[in-house]
Amino acid sequence: MKYGIVIFPPKRIQDFANSYRKRYDSHYALIPPHITLKYPFEADEEQIKKMAKELRRIAAETPPIPIKVTKFSSFYPTSNIIYLKVEPNDVLERLHEQLHSGLFAGKPEFVFVPHITIGRDLPGAEYADVYSQLKLQDVHFEETVDRFHLLYQLENGSWTVYETFIVGGKETV
């Protein structure tokens, strides 16, 4: 089965992202706005139980996670993805590192650029038009989150929560 590890930002950031995603993101119906900590990976039930135990340990040692969204940006020319830039910070960086070492070993597929995707699969001309407008907008959110999530992918391609991990030593939901 395919799994991934993400942070869901607070509701007001999700609502802001969704106001764009519903028009520009082909994955809008498959997963809520999120910050990817570990890209999708395959694991069996035994592996995922061990990983969930390790994620509980990591969560217990992780402080609340600051989320600061500062602007629209893009991965162009690598891809036509438009996103909300989440400023890197020590907590996010450390969490990302922990999710790519030990039991989770494996070099990350991409350099860690914390972000919330709001547009993908846009044809070149539409991408250029949309991004040229969005990059001029003023964006500023500062929030703190207290959890991250292990997700699994359903047969229809959508993602659902397998387990939620509360940071700072609280019990899991």
Swiss-Prot record:
Tree of life domain: Bacteria
Location of the active site: 34, 115
Record-annotated disulphide pairs: none
Motif HXTX 2 per record, residues: 115-118
EC number per UniProt: 3.1.-.-
Keywords: Hydrolase
Recorded family membership: Belongs to the 2H phosphoesterase superfamily. YjcG family.
Listed name of the protein: Putative phosphoesterase GK0864
Biological source species: Geobacillus kaustophilus (strain HTA426)
Lineage, opening ranks: Bacteria, Bacillati, Bacillota, Bacilli, Bacillales
